[in-house]
Each structure stands twice: as C-alpha cells, then as structure tokens.
C-alpha cells in the first residue's frame, strides 16, 4: 500500500471515529421537548392573518426560544376542535456536558383550517422559563384570536 493510501485510510478512520463520538452531528444523545414559548419577560409571537375564510387553510408561524443545546425546531402538532386550534411545537435538545450561552429563535410553521365561522383562538402550548420557575421549565400557553368568515 502506498503512503498516500495509508494516509487516506488513516484520515478516514480518524474522521469516522470523531463523527461517531460527536452527538451533535449524529443526533444520538438528543431529546425532543416541548418548545420554550415564554422566556422570562419575552413571549412567543404567533403570526397569522387577522381574518381568514371558513374551510380554507392558512399559515401560522410561531417563534419559540432556543440556544445553548437547543438548536433545532422539530415539529408542531395541531389539534382543531370547533373554534380552538391547539398547536404544540417541539424542539430538539442535545445531551451535552457544555453548551453555548446564546439565545436563538426557532420557528415552527403549520397549516390550520377552521370549518366554523366567528371568533376562533390559536392556542400555542409549550414550556416557560423565568423568575417564577427558577432554572426549571413549567407549562405555558400563548393565545391569539382570529376571525373566520
């Protein structure tokens, strides 16, 4: 085997070892958690039209909080019953010994459709962190009313 092939094989072995040891790259050692929607004095924003048409889907965009070991928006579950749409966003958090000390906004986009008219509510359910919860998270919700014609 030539020196070039031995070096290539050695570098490939080192790269595979490093990749296998890095949880952040492979996704191993992570957990999916309810998104943080209230962070101290800041609340998530719910971006949606003020008025929508009955039976027509529309886009809802939710800003959640991340940073540190939480760096990815994973999914948002939607359940609609009458005039209420419950949206539960989830983010991925890496299990790590050390994380960055930053704050990120992670966005979730969903489609919602109401089949009834009148005043309806978009309810985002997730977690909160603040002075009242200390270093742990607690349940939270943020709502926005819209009109269906």
Stretch-by-stretch model annotation:
Residues 127-141:
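Short acidic/polar inter-strand loop motif in beta-rich domains
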Residues 1-23:
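Sec-dependent bacterial lipoprotein signal peptides
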Residues 88-114:
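An anionic, turn-rich surface loop/hairpin at beta-sheet edges
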Residues 54-60:
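Structural beta-strand segments of beta-rich domains
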Residues 16-41:
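Bacterial Sec-dependent N-terminal signal peptides
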Residues 60-67:
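Aromatic/hydrophobic beta-strand junction motif of beta-rich domains
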Residues 47-52:
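Short beta-strand segments of immunoglobulin-like
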Residues 55, 116-121:
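Short tyrosine-centred short linear motifs in exposed loops/low-complexity segments
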